[in-house]
Amino acid sequence: MIWTAVIKGSALVTFVQGAMVLVDKIFGEEILPHRIYSSAEASQLLGMDRLEVLGLIRSGTIKAKKVGDNYRILGSNLVDYMNR
């Protein structure tokens, strides 16, 4: 009987933790100005497709540096884009 309560309690705790992580992912994404983001991360933060982000980079709308085959974007550049 006690083990049933322990299992149910741990399942509830796991569910609540998962819900908190999900809420944080949806509503708590904060762009850190000094952090460096990949184009994939930037697309998630901006709520657009990665190809759209690449287009904005290539047009000069978002400043980024190419490292190897990938672009790296400073968080402050994402904030600047969002404040336009």
Curated annotation (Swiss-Prot):
Name one cellular component (GO) term.
Answer: magnetosome
UniProt xrefs under InterPro entries: HTH_17
Which keywords belong to this entry?
A: Biomineralization, Magnetosome
Q: What induces it?
A: Locus amb0973 is part of the probable 18 gene mamAB operon.
Primary location group: other
- Keyword hit for Mitochondrion: no
Subcellular localization is given as: Magnetosome
Q: Does the keyword Hydrolase apply?
A: no
Phenotype on deletion?
Answer: When both copies of this protein are deleted cells have a weak magnetic response and make magnetosome membranes; the magnetosomes are less numerous and smaller. Deletion of just amb0973 leads to an intermediate magnetic response and still makes magnetosome membranes. Deletion of genes mamH to mamV (amb0961 to amb0978) gives cells with no magnetosomes and no magnetic response.
Q: What does this chain do?
A: May play a role in controlling magnetite number and size but not in control of magnetite morphology.
Q: Which family does it belong to?
A: Belongs to the magnetosome MamR family.
Q: What else is known?
A: This bacteria makes up to 20 cubo-octahedral magnetosomes of about 45 nm in diameter which contain membrane-bound crystals of magnetite (Fe(3)O(4)). Expression of just the minimal mamAB gene cluster (amb0961 to amb0978), including this gene, is sufficient to form a minimal magnetosome chain with small magnetite particles.
Task: List, alphabetically, the NCBIfam families matched.
Answer: MamR
Q: What is this protein called?
A: Magnetosome protein MamR
Originating species: Paramagnetospirillum magneticum (strain ATCC 700264 / AMB-1)
